[in-house]
Amino acid sequence: MAKTVADVMTANPAVVRPKTALKEAIKLLAQKEISGLPVVDEAGKLVGVLSETDLMWQETGVDPPPYFIFLDSVIYLQNPTRYEKELHKALGQTVGEVMSAQPISITGDHSLKEAAQLMNKRKVRRLPVVDEANKVIGIITRGDIVRTMANE
């Protein structure tokens, strides 16, 4: 029988909250030697993901030309409100200010093939695994899938 996401995921992963200090989240990433964290609300429901890509905002010097390239994306300054939001994200000091909102997630009953296809399609390296109430119960990474394939 084919393995499911629940068979391979890391259960009870480290998580952070939107109000967690960014410095604290970075320390947690380093201690756990991981590249991303699910962000949950007080009820444990998934509200975002913090990744190394999100943290790259912190390393960017912001000099507002008519447009600028930020994390390989061209951001045009035709809309000053959007620029202000992007600048604020770049300089944010809490997880909530830097995280990727509207995260892509998966439930444990999906197949590994479905998880791999979703990661590839959405260009993500990890998927928070949620239950029917959208509470984080695990995390699955590309590495988890590759290691499972190698052991079969």
Question: PLM ranges: what are they?
Answer:
Residues 131-132, 148:
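A periodicity- and composition-biased signal for non-globular, repetitive helical segments
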